[in-house]
UniProtKB/Swiss-Prot annotation:
Lineage: Viruses, Duplodnaviria, Heunggongvirae, Peploviricota, Herviviricetes
Superkingdom of source: Viruses
Name recorded for this polypeptide: Uncharacterized protein ORF1
């Protein structure tokens, strides 16, 4: 099992050997979006939105064990929280530049809270994302996908 997981993470270059089904393309897209070549902080809100949708609609239906389903669900929720925190942080940082905001201390406190939540979520996603890449990669291989 550990060997298979290692093989899945050797490369994120996934090829289907000819025409690839939509399910395999979607799984390859999830791995590509979440693979650790890109720092979590650089993943855009749009990419997070796409990854959440792909996990829910393309990956979860192919999970055969409750553990895989739980892992996909948990990571999907984590990505949604990260997307929301990233959006919220952007909003508060914009607001903190607006001098017409009446309560300076509240503005700074809200910005710090958003930054702390965002930083914690980035750390958690960074720690857990390769686990979900292993899971998706295993499902991808089981469905006939190939590593290139």
């Amino acid at each position: 099992m550990a060997q298979q997981q290692h093989e899945v993470t050797v490369t994120a270059e996934l090829v289907g050997g000819g025409e690839m089904s939509k399910e395999l393309r979607d799984m390859a897209a999830v791995v590509s979006l979440l693979h650790d070549r890109k720092p979590v902080e650089e993943i855009t809100c749009q990419e997070l939105r796409v990854a959440c949708a792909l996990l829910k609609n393309a990956v979860r239906p192919h999970c055969s064990t409750d553990d895989d389903k739980a892992a996909v669900d948990e990571f999907g929720r984590l990505l949604e929280r990260l997307r929301d925190a990233k959006s919220g942080l952007g909003l508060f940082m914009t607001m903190s530049r607006d001098d017409s905001w009446p309560m300076e201390n509240m503005r700074r406190a809200l910005t710090r809270m958003c930054q702390l939540d965002y930083d914690n979520l980035v750390r958690e996603v960074s720690e857990k994302r390769m686990d979900i890449v292993h899971t998706v990669g295993r499902l991808y291989l089981a469905m006939g996908g190939h590593l290139g």
